[in-house]
């Protein structure tokens, strides 16, 4: 039985965490509080430890095979989002960005365009460009929403006009790489917004690939007026779309990565074109860990989500007290907070370096997230009350 009376976020001290050797705890000196990378300060969930321990005890450390991953995701998705994905359309792959890369290789060719909606997860840029694809930006609005006019202009640029233009030579292949829920802003796209995206994509012949890794971290059921997560493949018009899911973000399994890609009915053949070799690097222990998380993790995840809601409220209150010039972007998902510091630092000052030097807090540099990121910082809320309080109080030195 899992004790949910104490949030997983409040079980480890700073001394406990500094025993870790992951990038979060080794990238900076010990006098810096690391609040930059999306890694949580929680002990590993007992059901994950048990699943991995059982596998190790019997030597179940061979190659992965089958649909174990998707079979565990299906009932989880039914419980959390009232959605029943089709496990038979799935492909288990080493992690989300490997899955995205393999899908881009199938759907596009070098020189084709990938549309992104910045500010957005930085690897969307790196992986896309490493494959020789062009990045076309369709920035979110100042409120962090998808903008149909901006998207349509990006689709037109990406496709050379697309099927909607009727121009000779138009209709180059293109993909929209959608982050849903959105990192770093915490935006949860509404069903209506997703329907609009799919309608525009259909008109311009743009394929939609969604990274839905942050889906378990929406909190509409815990707050007033929040937006619930809508799986892309549950929306009309998603027949040719592909969505990628992983438990690694919600259950802190970045060191045991795995993912599953799911296809709409018209994209099944495309997903099957992903080479078999792409799945050879799937970590069988990771699949077992993720399957255990999806199967046994509801109570643990709910306690964690409640802690994130509490921490978001705490950070908002403390920032207003200690750094009132910093504006907090409202969020409905993820465990990240997007901070607008444009009025808090003098012109010409690098906010990331300024905070690191004066406050000894490492935050995510907004410039890494593409258009609209300059003058912003990303704060990780997935830590204890004590550490979060100390970090925000330190930020008061910088702002």
Regions picked out by a protein language model, each given a short descriptive name:
Residues 237-309, 399:
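Conserved core segment of the aminotransferase class I/II
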């Amino acid at each position: 039985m899992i004790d949910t009376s104490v949030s997983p976020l409040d079980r480890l001290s700073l001394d406990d965490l500094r025993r870790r050797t992951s990038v979060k705890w080794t990238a900076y000196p010990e006098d810096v509080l690391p609040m930059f990378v999306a890694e949580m300060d929680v002990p590993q969930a007992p059901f994950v430890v048990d699943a991995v321990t059982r596998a190790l005890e019997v030597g179940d450390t061979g190659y992965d095979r089958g649909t174990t991953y998707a079979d565990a995701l299906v009932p989880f998705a039914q419980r959390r989002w009232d959605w029943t994905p089709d496990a038979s359309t799935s492909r288990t792959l080493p992690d989300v960005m490997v899955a995205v890369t393999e899908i881009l290789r199938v759907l596009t060719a070098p020189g084709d365009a990938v549309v992104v909606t910045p500010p957005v997860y930085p690897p969307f840029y790196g992986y896309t460009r490493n494959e020789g694809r062009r990045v076309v930006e369709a920035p979110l609005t100042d409120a962090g929403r998808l903008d149909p006019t901006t998207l349509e202009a990006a689709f037109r640029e990406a496709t050379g006009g697309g099927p909607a233009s009727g121009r000779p030579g138009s209709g180059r292949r293109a993909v929209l790489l959608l982050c849903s829920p959105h990192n770093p802003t915490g935006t949860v796209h509404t069903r209506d917004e997703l329907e609009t995206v799919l309608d525009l994509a259909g008109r311009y012949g743009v394929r939609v690939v969604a990274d839905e890794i942050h889906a378990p971290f929406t909190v509409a059921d815990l707050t007033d007026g929040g937006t619930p997560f809508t799986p892309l493949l549950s929306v009309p018009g998603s027949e040719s779309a592909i969505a990628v899911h992983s438990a690694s973000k919600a259950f802190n399994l970045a060191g045991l990565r795995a993912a599953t890609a799911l296809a709409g009915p018209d994209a099944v053949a495309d997903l099957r074109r992903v080479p078999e070799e792409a799945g050879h690097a799937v970590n069988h222990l990771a699949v077992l860990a993720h399957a255990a998380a999806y199967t046994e993790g509801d109570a643990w995840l709910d306690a964690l989500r409640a802690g994130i809601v509490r921490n978001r409220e705490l950070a908002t209150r403390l920032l207003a007290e200690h750094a009132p010039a910093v504006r907090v972007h409202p969020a409905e998902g993820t465990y990240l907070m997007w901070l607008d510091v444009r009025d808090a630092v003098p012109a010409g000052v690098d906010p990331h370096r300024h905070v690191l030097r004066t406050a000894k807090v490492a935050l995510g540099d907004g410039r890494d997230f593409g258009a609209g990121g300059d003058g912003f910082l990303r704060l990780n809320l997935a830590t204890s009350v004590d550490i979060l309080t100390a970090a925000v109080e330190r930020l008061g030195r910088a702002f």
